[in-house]
Amino acid sequence: MDKKTSRLRRALRGRKKIQELGVNRLVVHRTPRHTYAQVISPDSQVLASASTAEKAVTEQLKYTGNVDAAKVVGKTVAERAIEKGVTVVAFDRSGFKYHGRVAALADAAREAGLKF
């Protein structure tokens, strides 16, 4: 089993648990160059999103693939979710370790007002 398949299997286990709870989830995806975050409802509707691929976010950054960029994405997605009335979410790390950019995004979202 390769590295990507292992990550996807971990992601499915976590998502199944979150779907049983029936709450909105904050989904994180990362690539070497970008970090993406979405708030998704239990019926699979995207309520808010932010990524380092967006011009509004990229203008604030020197480089898009680091911890500082993840903090900006976390803050932005939290602000957009709160505007839509979403304050409580479950954190879906998509099989990535809770470390580095993933942890930085989560901490920034918490500081901006999301509860999880």
UniProtKB/Swiss-Prot annotation:
GO terms (BP aspect): translation
Xref: InterPro entries: Ribosomal_uL18_bac-type, Ribosomal_uL18_bac/euk
Matches recorded under Gene3D superfamilies: 3.30.420.100
Origin superkingdom: Bacteria
Signal peptide span: none
Alphabetized Pfam families for the sequence: Ribosomal_L18p
This protein's UniProt keywords: Ribonucleoprotein, Ribosomal protein, RNA-binding, rRNA-binding
Family annotation (SUPFAM superfamilies): Translational machinery components
Keyword Ribonucleoprotein appears in the UniProt entry: yes
One Gene Ontology term of the molecular function aspect: structural constituent of ribosome
GO cellular component, one term: cytosolic large ribosomal subunit
Protein family (similarity comment): Belongs to the universal ribosomal protein uL18 family.
PANTHER family given in the database record: 39S RIBOSOMAL PROTEIN L18, MITOCHONDRIAL (PTHR12899), LARGE RIBOSOMAL SUBUNIT PROTEIN UL18M (PTHR12899:SF3)
NCBIfam families per UniProt: L18_bact
Function statement: This is one of the proteins that bind and probably mediate the attachment of the 5S RNA into the large ribosomal subunit, where it forms part of the central protuberance.
Oligomeric form and interacting partners: Part of the 50S ribosomal subunit; part of the 5S rRNA/L5/L18/L25 subcomplex. Contacts the 5S and 23S rRNAs.
Protein known as: Large ribosomal subunit protein uL18
Provenance organism: Shewanella woodyi (strain ATCC 51908 / MS32)
Biological classification of the source: Bacteria, Pseudomonadati, Pseudomonadota, Gammaproteobacteria, Alteromonadales
